[in-house]
Amino acid sequence: MAITKSKQQKTRKKVKRVVSDGIVHIHASFNNTIVTFTDRQGNALCWATSGGSGFRGSRKSTPYAAQVATERAAAVAKEYGMKSVAVFVHGPGPGRESTIRELITQDFKIVEITDVTGIPHNGCKPPIKRRV
């Protein structure tokens, strides 16, 4: 009898809140691009990656893969009612510019664009450039 009661637990429907303005964090590395939509306090609403969008291997690090990832995350962010965003770009990857272009085509009002890429004060030795 106790087993059937535990299986019939009440599940509450998740209420989506309305967020009119937020922040887009773009982490563009050489291998992948991660796009995260947050509210003003930094609570994540939705995210997408180029690897999770169906791209694998070297195609994952292309600007088109970053564009598709932004398109997927923007569709979910519009369900929250987001209209204006501040963009924080982190990293030197190829998906930096195409992600911002896709945000413009998705009709988001971009309030500010900030580059928050870390600059080493003579920290780790950078990887050696490939000679192909």
From Swiss-Prot:
- So which domain of life are we looking at? Bacteria
Any one GO cellular component localisation term in the record: ribosome
For whether the record's keyword set contains Ribonucleoprotein, the answer is yes
Q: List the disulfide bonds.
A: none
The Gene Ontology terms for molecular function here are: rRNA binding; structural constituent of ribosome
Q: Name one GO biological process term.
A: translation
- What UniProt keywords are attached to this protein's entry? Ribonucleoprotein, Ribosomal protein, RNA-binding, rRNA-binding
Function comment: Located on the platform of the 30S subunit, it bridges several disparate RNA helices of the 16S rRNA. Forms part of the Shine-Dalgarno cleft in the 70S ribosome.
Family per similarity comment: Belongs to the universal ribosomal protein uS11 family.
State whether it acts alone or in a complex, and with which partners, per the record.
Answer: Part of the 30S ribosomal subunit. Interacts with proteins S7 and S18. Binds to IF-3.
Question: What is this protein called in UniProt?
Answer: Small ribosomal subunit protein uS11
| Species of the source | Legionella pneumophila (strain Corby)
